[in-house]
Amino acid sequence: MALISLTNGYLSFSDAPLLDHAELHIEPNECVCLVGRNGAGKSTLLKIIAGDVLMDDGKIQYEKDLVVSRLEQDPPRNAQGNIFDYVAEGVGHLTDLLKEYHQISVQLEENYSDQILSQLEQVQAKLEHADGWRFENKINEVLLKLGLNPNTKLSALSGGWLRKAALARALVCDPDVLLLDEPTNHLDVEAIEWLENFLLDFQGSIVFISHDRSFIRKMATRIVDLDRGQLVSYPGNYDLYLTTKEENLRVEALQNELFDKRLAQEEVWIRQGIKARRTRNEGRVRALKVMREERRQRRDVMGTAKLQLDTSSRSGKIVFEMEDVSYEIAGKTLLKDFSTTILRGDKIALVGPNGCGKTTFIKLLLGEIQPTSGKIRCGTKLEIAYFDQYRADLDPEKTVMDNVADGKQDIEINGVKRHVLGYLQDFLFPPKRAMTPVKALSGGERNRLLLAKLLLKPNNLLILDEPTNDLDVETLELLEEILTDYQGTLLIVSHDRQFIDNTATECYLFEGKGHLNKYVGGFFDAKQQQANFWASKAVEEQAKAKKSEPLKEESAVKNDRTSKPKSVKLSYKEQRELEQLPQLLEELETKITVLQAEIADPAFFQQAHDITDAKLKALADTEAELETAFLRWEELEEKKNLVEGKA
């Protein structure tokens, strides 16, 4: 039985309805990806499923006591309190208890007293009774993986960080159905991969919207296409959907062509005059009227954007040269002793976590900031086009047309003059929309407009900082084709793994503490090389560690004889942690054994790169987690023994 059933759904805000008597059924334990062009109504459909928007007609039914959680595309900006409280509200029945526990814990850390400790113990007992620790641990895990400080005030968050907090809130409540609108937006690759694994373990149904094709391929068990008001279900994976959809559109185009040809013939016949109005032909006249109405009601497929680059003369052979470049800010090293030569025609992707220094790297190359040490030399004859992730190159008060042509009627691309309205239609801006102020545009429309403006500028060095945000898949794929054929030098900052893999020939991976390493190939090739490099390094470190163990043990014995036990005491939190660590260690060891067996299989490396890469990374992460957990267990055990010995 379906968890949610939408039947005969109809909703319209304009001439063309978003839902035109559509149907959708969400079954238990499935992961549905909702696809469609920008503006098709995908986000509105999620709001309908969540019960936040009512349809004009139709019915939606839910299984009894069904719990639905939704991540909004644009989280509310007027939320109050700190991140922990906001996320805990997603749990519902335990919200107040979890908030109280967090607040008292913070008070205890800042100002210890027996009274506060007593309050904490009372709340802990209530949480224990209500099985609340599971949710408290989940909240802390999600916040950690998304890089969120639980005590940060929501009012201090930018839109991207607020969206992360909203994602955390949607994930923690154990719903039956999880609705996610662009969950990978503003997440770096590491966070996206964690989210994928988190959702794969989720015991419920998921309906999500995403333009991240790698994410869709990994997650979706079914594709539902919202196309011109209709919901069409495609069982199976994303690639099967693409093939089937292409064939369906081909058949539809052929049928429309035949219909239009027959309609044209009937129109010629009706104009022949009196013969058409004889009684014996009244049926044919009525049929023609039906055909006219059918053609009037038909909604044609939306066109795709038409992109082309205005390339300039070639740059010099060497575009940039960096020699032992370091950069520090506020005591943090973003780049350390990095050297490279970027040549004409190179297509390089900068990959790393949020805040690691990718945009800083570009600013260093462009001379907008100076390195702390080292030298950067620019090549000759450079003409640069820069796609800024903050969209600062757009004037929100000006119209779409004026942003591109600055009040002129004509633009020039590759030596050919065109009317600005015709050019903007290539980017899916009809004349009426071209006269709209930029501040009224959606995120996807702003991205298309920035591309339209950027591609007008003659260039031989193209820098794209997060170009894929809010672009629909069709426009993304067209952009990829153009960049593949681009003869200049390309620098990309993106968290879209498929986009990087399809456009870059080399990846610079930020690996922490200012270390930046270069790998040949697209994203998945680079990650495979990185995994192999760190795996071999881990083996070397283990070998060194084994050699030094006898010396460490001898030193430890001497230290034990001479050192005096310190006065220490385990806190309640530490006692709980110590009790839980043995089970965690056992689980991690089991997980490592399973992963090692999978990797040892001869067929392992015959799988797709993203699968092998994920397994290798999971093994490295789990081994690191085991080591950290074991060291923590040793630390707490030693602390406990010192206390007992003193007593």
UniProtKB/Swiss-Prot annotation:
Catalytic activity: ATP + H2O = ADP + phosphate + H(+)
Compositional bias segments (type: Basic and acidic residues): 545-563
Alphabetized UniProt keyword annotations: ATP-binding, Cytoplasm, DNA damage, DNA repair, DNA-binding, Hydrolase, Nucleotide-binding, Repeat
Protein EC: 3.6.1.-
Domain ABC transporter, chain residue ranges per copy: 1-253, 320-546
Subcellular location: Cytoplasm
Chain residues that bind ATP 1: G36, R37, N38, G39, A40, G41, K42, S43
InterPro entries: AAA+_ATPase, ABC_tran_C, ABC_tran_Xtn, ABC_transporter-like_ATP-bd, ABC_transporter-like_CS, ABCF_ATPase, P-loop_NTPase, Uup
GO cellular component: cytoplasm
Single Gene Ontology BP annotation: DNA repair
Domain notes: The C-terminal domain (CTD) helps bind DNA.
Family per similarity comment: Belongs to the ABC transporter superfamily. ABCF family. Uup subfamily.
Protein name: ATP-binding protein Uup
Phylogenetic placement of the source organism: Bacteria, Pseudomonadati, Pseudomonadota, Gammaproteobacteria, Pasteurellales
Protein encoded by which gene: uup
